[in-house]
Amino acid sequence: MTRLKTDIRVAALLKRAQGSGAFAVVLRRGDADAGALWVIVRQGRDLMLYTEQMVMSGARNWYQDGPFDETEMQLRTNKAVDRDPDIWIVEIEHPHGRPFLDGETAKTETAAEVAAKALFRGQ
């Protein structure tokens, strides 16, 4: 299955968000071809984190985690960059917390929900 390059996906995300009146900015540029993508959504003081994960079918799903304060989010992003220097980080500020993610948004789960499902499946 052919995947769009990350820089193209980020450009589309920025266009969707900014076209709807949200503020969106690239906080960190990663590998243009295949860098992982994290999206931070700011709603007031709350920060939600959306990360992409590849699932067994080969599809990519978004997972939501948070809310976090500024300090916790900075710690998370710093650790992510240390582990993966190719990562992209985009921040979107929207009054209703809309993430503007692409069509792969059908499944959003918190990290705790993912862990619980894995536990009950015996993994």
Regions found by a protein language model. Name each.
Residues 1-123:
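Polybasic/polar functional segments that serve as interface/processing modules
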